[in-house]
Amino acid sequence: MKKYIVALDQGTTSSRAIIFDKEQNIIGVSQKEFNQIYPREGWVEHDPMEIWATQYSVLQEVMAKCNITQENIAAIGITNQRETTIVWDKNTGVPIYNAIVWQCRRTADICDELKERDGLVDYIRENTGLVLDAYFSGTKIKWILDNVEGAREKAEKGELLFGTVDSWLVWKLTNGKVHVTDYTNASRTMIFNIKNLEWDERMLKELDIPRSMLPEVKNSSEIYGYANLGAKGGIRVPIAGIAGDQQAALFGQAAFNKGDVKNTYGTGCFLLMNTGEELVKSKSGLLTTIAIGLHGKVQYALEGSVFVGGAVIQWLRDELRIISDSSDTEYFATKVEDNGGVYVVPAFVGLGAPYWDMYARGTIVGLTRGTNRNHIIRAALESIAYQTRDVLEAMINDVGYDINCIKVDGGASRNNFLMQFQSDLVGKKVIKPIITETTALGAAYLAGLAVGYWSDKEEIAKLWFASEEFEPTISEERRNKYHKKWKKAVERSKGWALED
């Protein structure tokens, strides 16, 4: 009987299920979007029950579409939007509040208060690898416990559970039998110590989070539990791989070696560099995070998180309405010779790496009477590449060695104008893989390795092939001139939302 691996890819805007075979061919894909909830300015939520409903329905749908039963599934791998925080009742399984999404800035005030505490900023940097920011799960958990009536009392009694989205899905798939996360997701919470690989006692104390709420932290590739996808008493399918979306993409790009770099152009942009077993402390505003955890050992990575990448294209379409489809951007961007001196800094929810300014806001600078919509579309696209260059420069500065190329994936990597401009701007080769579903593929690899579907990383590396390569076509002088102007535009956006 032919066996397959199913990857559940739970993203910021949609839930997807993808079936892969042993040669990493995609056999089937199902996807459902779900609601984005914006209760106030800067707040972003999801309904956890809708996350679960859409994720489970696409799993059933893709199996039906491909005429595959649970007997054909060797294992399930899960990859997920990271940092997004869910707290639910251990006994009823009902979430006590909506999921607070990674983009949500509601805990900026909590972060400001924590920054006043003696030595805490440095402690967080040193032990969690992160910066003190509203982006991570820790302050989101605190907010829920402090603001949902009765939550803190229930948490103290051991009646509440916290999980990132992976934990929530595993808990639901196993009917509440398994409460786990993996090293990669734990490393994004700001309450996990990436040196001793344990939940950090001081951080739990500082944020007043009971340890009983927390999931057990496991390898990124092992059997965590079993999902029963059919009628009661049917075949139980092992859930055998978990990784946060960006780490899954790094693994799916076969970036197994020290110095390998990938950039995912999704809602945000996420540049990761594998630093092997070396925990590199960033001097440049990057995060030190766990790349993957296998066999009780971890590899580390440097990460630059850009909050608004492909989301700037959605903004052009949904808010400005100057394009009707995301794919139109490439056409309009090439209708003008250059950006006409226009720079878009899409700091809609603040600036991520390497600036970390929660109070920055979006700006468009350099407008003249001659500016038309094509200039704005082009400048918006270019902003994705500029932010990537900022992060890459910081990375190279931190590790002290250069890189040869960037492996790319994510929706916006389909835009050839953007990929060529990216190569021009960083002066490096940009390589697109044949399989661009690298996030789901990474989760599939992790699950497959745990059950012996693939034997080892070497077998996987042989399956990775490039589909397109982009080489730089402009001079260093020109790329630096462009970048200097961009930096000037960034300065204009900083601190905008601060009260006078």
UniProtKB/Swiss-Prot annotation:
Swiss-Prot/TrEMBL catalytic activity: glycerol + ATP = sn-glycerol 3-phosphate + ADP + H(+)
Binding positions for glycerol per the UniProt entry: R82, E83, Y135, D245, Q246
Activity regulation as described: Activated by phosphorylation and inhibited by fructose 1,6-bisphosphate (FBP).
GO annotation terms (biological process): glycerol catabolic process; glycerol metabolic process; glycerol-3-phosphate metabolic process
Top-rank taxon, per record: Bacteria
Keywords linked to the UniProt accession: ATP-binding, Glycerol metabolism, Kinase, Nucleotide-binding, Transferase
Pathway given in the UniProt record: Polyol metabolism; glycerol degradation via glycerol kinase pathway; sn-glycerol 3-phosphate from glycerol: step 1/1
Gene: glpK
SUPFAM superfamilies on file: Actin-like ATPase domain
Primary role: Key enzyme in the regulation of glycerol uptake and metabolism. Catalyzes the phosphorylation of glycerol to yield sn-glycerol 3-phosphate.
Organism per entry: Clostridium perfringens (strain ATCC 13124 / DSM 756 / JCM 1290 / NCIMB 6125 / NCTC 8237 / Type A)
Residue positions binding ADP: T12, R16, T267, G310, G411, N415
EC number(s) given by UniProt: 2.7.1.30
Protein family per UniProt: Belongs to the FGGY kinase family.
The protein, known as: Glycerol kinase
Subunit text: Homotetramer and homodimer (in equilibrium).
